[in-house]
Amino acid sequence: VSPFKASNLSSSWYMTGSGAPVGVGQAFQAFASGIAPDADMGPFILKPENGKVIRYLRGRPCDLSVEESVSEALSSFDSLSGRYDLVVCEGSGSPAELNLKGSDIANMRMVRERDIPAVIVGDIERGGVFAAIYGTWKLMPEEERRHLRGFIINRFRGDISVLNPGIEELESMTGMRCF
């Protein structure tokens, strides 16, 4: 199993054995999977520097078009897919940010390009988890929803029965399972 995140906003990175950086999160996930971190696990790193965000591709500053960026991200994903039985793709932020639809390479673009099954993960600690999950689902066009396999509510602690009415309503409204 290999982690993958096409684009990662991070102020630090981990240097791989080949000398190319990868996001610290992807390095940690790789170690947890028992494999060595690889730059293909996170080809793009957006690093805040001096009040700006500098975009790096495998450790080198870059200024690529969206299509060139997608091509690079797909190349990294394909490389990992050829070496591992399973590649777990992590998105970045929300897959339904209307203002970023045309330039987002880390979320549904990867899913659509490689027909990757997806789940929406909602963070209960931020509050409004059912509204966030349902709103995200509702904003997604049907061509993207067809890739969804369900929802996950993250960071819940306590008696799960407290969530059951909300889970049942969410599943009824969307026809999708909440895991």
Language model feature labels by segment:
Residues 1-179:
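Flexible phosphate-sensing "switch/lid" loops adjacent to ATP/NTP-binding sites
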